[in-house]
Amino acid sequence: MLKPLGDRVVIELVQAEEKTASGIVLPETAKEKPQEGKVIAVGTGRVLENGERVALEVAAGDLIIFSKYAGTEVKYEGTDYLILRESDILAIIG
């Protein structure tokens, strides 16, 4: 399993819609880059200048919305993941 360091988070992307609301099938080139994902793992937190560690606000299992071009895409054991910093997370869904 991937274990992120510091204030990083590993997420599994929620797949983009295959069709529009009116039923038109979208080709790969027309799909929006996904901005939603499920948190798979979280790092130990951010370290302040005084050495104190601050825990992350998100937890494994949370559904999140993140910045459009944030993070680094990685493939691990055949699954695509995104590793990003907690500051790139915009909201927790639900």
UniProtKB/Swiss-Prot annotation:
- InterPro entries xrefs: Chaperonin_GroES (IPR020818), Chaperonin_GroES_sf (IPR037124), Chaprnonin_Cpn10_CS (IPR018369), GroES-like_sf (IPR011032)
Q: Which GO terms describe its molecular function?
A: ATP binding; metal ion binding; protein folding chaperone; protein-folding chaperone binding; unfolded protein binding
Principal location listed in the UniProt entry: cytoplasm
Note the superkingdom of the native organism: Bacteria
Keywords, A to Z, come to:
Chaperone, Cytoplasm
Describe the protein's quaternary organization and the partners it interacts with: Heptamer of 7 subunits arranged in a ring. Interacts with the chaperonin GroEL.
Q: Spell out the protein name for this chain.
A: Co-chaperonin GroES
Say which species the protein is native to. Answer: Bacillus mycoides (strain KBAB4)
What lineage, starting at the top, does this entry show?
Bacteria, Bacillati, Bacillota, Bacilli, Bacillales
